[in-house]
Amino acid sequence: LATCPFFYVAAQYANHDMLVAGLITAAILALAIAVERPPQVQLGWLLAGSLACALATLAKGLIGFVLPVLVIVPWLLAQGRWRQLVKLLHPLGVLVFLLVAAPWFVVTQMSYPAFFDYFFVEQHFRRFALSSFNNVAPFWFFIVLLPALTLPWSVWLPRALKYAWSTRDARIALYGWWVIAIVGFFSFPSSKITGYVLPAAAPWCALLTLLIARGNTRLWQWVMGAAALVCVLIVAVIAWQAPKSNRAAALVLAARIAPADSVVMVDEYFYDLPFYARLNRPVIIASDWADPALPTRDNWRKELFDATRFAPALGREVLRPLNALDSLLCGTGAVWFVVVPKQAQRVAGLAGITRVFSNANTELWRAPAHACP
């Protein structure tokens, strides 16, 4: 796993995919260890698995416990170990899960009465069933993607499959079913993102490792060295290309902004700018909020648009139409527009505006306030 490109490509994204994949992996392994001495269930490992399921649920919703259940339950039933399955429902395990996961959901629902419908119904069931949401890909997308992202080790896949099919080792069966369950689960929805299949990375690599370790030692050691070098190069390229920091623009803004001034981000959200500029109130985001395609794209616009359901007054204040930028100049303070260079023409014609800062990633423009009729 540590020498697979998949691991490093996925790690560059600032989202919860790696976190929930790690927690789901920890949950499945803990539950598998809990039942490794049939017919007993080791309570300590069961509680660890319950805790990991709860944390995974907090990280990214119901898949935090649905996927571990989808892996462990059929695996035990296929071996006729239903007594252990019943013991996994130990009251202490259920209690740990509820104590960790439930309070946040309860408090959020009490604060925002529409939360349960949005989070559980829309973000799970409706989104799972939609055929046109976000990155639409064919059913076989992950079946092709997983071997591609785990090269060079996936070259051993045919032999690994043959070995897994011929053995009756429960551990091999667990890893095999684990991969099938995760890949199958995320293959049914039409929306597919690379990070979805991360919970299958560990068992996939474990299957390949068990076979490779039985083969030519010199060969796999040479491949490991080459793979490690490739991964280092991937990290180097990402580190060289990826930085798109807005820190320089933010420092200029922080030095010159007045208390009465406002900040407007134009058709883009500059995540790090409020942090570096130490802004203490919400920025205004100008975009096409009436776009009918907005609900079908999983991006920053949809996140902010969805948030207006729970804070409509604040939404009306900070989410402004892109075609009414001049109206934002009405007030007592100056207005600072933050744009990507290719969008600079949207603000260049505003009354009295001047460009204060520019680099390859960001431009900062200042327009004085004026009285409006």
For each predicted feature, which ranges?
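Membrane-integral, polyisoprenol-dependent glycosyltransferases
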Residues: L1-R218, L279, A360
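Short, flexible loop segments at the rims of nucleotide/cofactor-binding pockets, characterized by
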Residues: V41, S132, I238-P243, P312-V318
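Active-site phosphate/pyrophosphate- and oxyanion-stabilizing loops and adjacent acidic/basic residues
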Residues: C53, L251, Y271
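Short glycine/proline- and acidic residue-enriched helix-loop micro-motifs
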Residues: A129-L130, F142, L233-A236, D306-F310
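Hydrophobic alpha-helical transmembrane segments in integral membrane proteins
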Residues: G195, V232-A255
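Signature aromatic-anchored transmembrane alpha helix within multi-pass, membrane-resident enzymes
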Residues: I212-V235
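Luminal/periplasmic acceptor-recognition loop/helix of membrane-associated glycosyltransferases
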Residues: S245-E268, L279-P373
